[in-house]
Amino acid sequence: MKKLLKFAPLCALLLAIVAFILLLATHSIEYSNGNLKGWYDGPAALFGKGQSLGAWGGLSVVGEFEGKAAWNAVLAFIFLIIALVALLISSVMVFVKIKALEKFGGLIALVAGGLLLVGGIFLFFTLPAFAAANEWNNTNNFALGGGWVVAAILAILGGVASACPAVLALVEKK
């Protein structure tokens, strides 16, 4: 079991990469009201500019969205990028046979795990922050996109996987 723990940052890195791709490639906010359905793509919530897609019956509409980004989605995106770099460094350092670098790699993985946890939690609150930033009064028919929900879950799981070896090492010492 202990030999497998050194692969935890690598597993967390893979989960973080998938979460990063999902943020950019899937719908961030979805709207549904009877026959009318609409979506905002990932960059719309992250950067305030992107595409809005809609469908009414059989008619499809594509438009440009220019609004304000959700502050927590921007922070989650930044945390995810920092965690990706940190996990890449940590994954390399763990496999280097220098003891001091191995411990430092574990510390970097712990910090990256915390960033992934906070970023994943922030992603769940994108809809209220996006609605407040763009002054929407009613969000009853809006929902967080499925890809973003999966990205948030993967980020949280990656954070737990990344922090697990460091936490277990601390518990083992006591």
Annotate each predicted stretch with a short phrase.
Residues M1-K2:
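Short, Lys/Arg-rich, polar N-terminal cytosolic tail immediately upstream
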